[in-house]
């Protein structure tokens, strides 16, 4: 292992396997050791916010907006790949690079905005898990929130044993979500030909479809996922030369394609399930609880329970990931962090306040997405700037077609976020043409 420096969290066995792979001594198991960061980050694309948006899209417009999910998934792959590359090449996360490179007049506001975004993210994910538990166990929502908090804290304690146990648990929950939606597709009558057609044929039936499309794409690249992915990728190993860095980036790109590909297919399955189950007879469904209560009489209790299990796995796993991202944001921007139990407790408070005040959980989810839309330019533009700097990234600086695609993706995401905010505040945005 002399040709590679391992970072805390790698077991001796894993570190040896990493060294063998980077030295070109391949084994059948070795590629699996690089899996983890993208799997964890992919949870951001299967969180309860995605559930609500995709259910609304499928219920109201059938398969018409599947192409939007495909576009969103491709953009997500690009930016998560850039985030992982940044961590591998520099050994630092995005927040640390901002602190070390930019003046305090910029980094302090960036930190505050990013912390608010992390709390807004955790609010949505925490509420999603709580809704799943409450509906599944027939408990009050407050009780569901308390159980969600305890479960997520228990998973977070695994971090004391290194990042691998945590990644395995998150990966297992990703598998649960994927299997649940595979089962749903076997139960729900899906028109596969229409689904395939609308995946590649863009269409916007009316102005309201634009609103939902913006909601799907505009919330795709999550601020906390960009911070977290760079940190997890940089925390693995310290490559000793350019060849090792290139290999790590290549393996990372493969993992991003696989993990985000699964996330994209899960999102497409959500839309297809909602289209097959609810469209056109139940077009007005827009809330998670309403979808659950409608599924049971339509397709049986089994379909409804599977839906809740997937929601629970999504809420718990994404809440864990959101807490980890919040820790990384604080550590990166200001150089210190608070105990994980304290952050978990603090991020639970807004959820209890929201529900205690009688705010509709779905409304709270929507408001959290507004906050994320406002915060998104901070990590996205910083990531683009760092990724294209040859002085920082060397030969792995993003350029050419990749740079053009990244800039184009940023313009699409930021433009759609502006449209989303305009629509939320009552400004009517007409369809093009």
UniProtKB/Swiss-Prot annotation:
Q: Which InterPro entries match?
A: NRAMP_fam (IPR001046)
Instruction: Give the bilayer topology.
Output: Multi-pass membrane protein
Pfam families listed in its UniProt record: Nramp (PF01566)
Spans traversing the lipid bilayer: 32-52, 62-82, 101-121, 131-151, 168-188, 209-229, 256-276, 296-316, 345-365, 366-386, 401-421
Q: Which UniProt keywords apply?
A: Cell inner membrane, Cell membrane, Ion transport, Membrane, Symport, Transmembrane, Transmembrane helix, Transport
Gene Ontology cellular-component terms listed: plasma membrane
Instruction: From the UniProt record, give one GO term of the biological process aspect.
Output: iron ion transmembrane transport
> Where found in the cell?
Cell inner membrane
* Major localization listed first in the record, in broad terms: membrane
Source domain of life: Bacteria
Q: Which GO terms describe its molecular function?
A: cadmium ion transmembrane transporter activity; manganese ion transmembrane transporter activity; metal ion binding; symporter activity
What's the family?
Belongs to the NRAMP family.
Tell me, in a sentence or two, what this protein's role is: H(+)-stimulated, divalent metal cation uptake system.
Q: What is this protein called?
A: Divalent metal cation transporter MntH
Q: Lineage of this protein's species? A: Bacteria, Pseudomonadati, Pseudomonadota, Alphaproteobacteria, Acetobacterales
